[in-house]
Amino acid sequence: MSVPQAREARRIDLGEMGWGEVQVDFYNPLVKRREIVMILHHELKPTPMRIMLRQKLAEVLGVDIKRIYIRYIKTGYGAGLSKVRVHVYDSPERALSFEPKYIIERNGGVNPFEEAEG
């Protein structure tokens, strides 16, 4: 049985938000998700909002936004760098069965761009 290997660091252009340097990118076959850890460079800009980062990553990775969840964004005081951990699931159903409720809510819920009724 082979051990999943980490891919080499690569750069992801995130438009106005800056750019990300992927440090770890591997597929977890047990959970059926891709786990990405990256350094987000956003010099002279605020830390990006989760929903905007999630939308841009969905566009760049070519997957549905319902399959992507930002686990954390950690930014040092005054730094234009943030460490970001992202989970990209094979299906939205798997994401909902593994991600804690508070993470789903932090990421804008199940349908992040659906308007609230009422």
From Swiss-Prot:
PROSITE patterns: RIBOSOMAL_S24E. Gene3D superfamilies: 3.30.70.3370. Transmembrane segments: none annotated. GO terms for biological process: translation. One of its GO terms (cellular component) is ribonucleoprotein complex. It comes from the Archaea. GO terms for molecular function: structural constituent of ribosome. Keywords: Ribonucleoprotein, Ribosomal protein. Belongs to the eukaryotic ribosomal protein eS24 family. This is Small ribosomal subunit protein eS24. It comes from Aeropyrum pernix (strain ATCC 700893 / DSM 11879 / JCM 9820 / NBRC 100138 / K1). The lineage of its organism: Archaea, Thermoproteota, Thermoprotei, Desulfurococcales, Desulfurococcaceae.
